[in-house]
Amino acid sequence: LCIAGSKKKTELPQKRKKIGFFIGNNFYDYLTAEENLHYYRQLKDIKDKEEVKRVLNLVGLEGVTSKYGSFSMGMKQRLGIANALLGSPEILLLDEPINGLDPQGIADIRTLIVSLNRKQNMTIIVSSHILGELEHTANKFGFVHQGTVLKEITHDDLKVKRSAVQIYVGDLEKARSVLKQNNIPVLQESSAYKSLEDYYFDLVGGKRCE
């Protein structure tokens, strides 16, 4: 295990403090967002009480006084991310952060993740089965199959390595025979890229639902 460039077992406990984890929501229904986070702040031995307000502001839950039990799914996910942000970690691990959300909730979490990455200069690792959504959010992808990382690519790799061009012409039959001569007017040309989902199934095999 290597964290922040270190493999020394004696350094791992300290290095782990630089990582924030979001794995499900373990909060008390009868407490507010702020009360729940103060509980976890103390568990993490964070002395600064203002840290709770800071992370609530980052995820857009500042001023919310209702109990956790009345939260929407999107609010619960935001609070889970806020908990992971306590202590200003350098790396944020998010496990299925958009699971169970409606389209608006997904868009909100996507915006939040991008904002944290850009404004807080934070490395964010997202584990998700919703590949189409990752394609809109991430800039680097790692494909894991049966516990093994098969390949890592960048967003640009996805386009460059798996690109195709579709050309629409007025006479398809004629185009098939004389296209190489380059003397047929092209009515429309567009670039078509394989999606992240397409790339995954090409890599590991299997068939997706159409």
PLM feature spans:
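Catalytic Walker B motif of ABC-type/P-loop ATPase nucleotide-binding domains
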Residues: 92-96
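Conserved ABC ATPase "signature" region
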Residues: 38, 49-64
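Hydrophobic anchor residue at the start of the ABC signature
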Residues: 81
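Helical segment within the ABC ATPase nucleotide-binding domain
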Residues: 106-120
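Conserved catalytic motifs of ABC-family nucleotide-binding domains
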Residues: 88
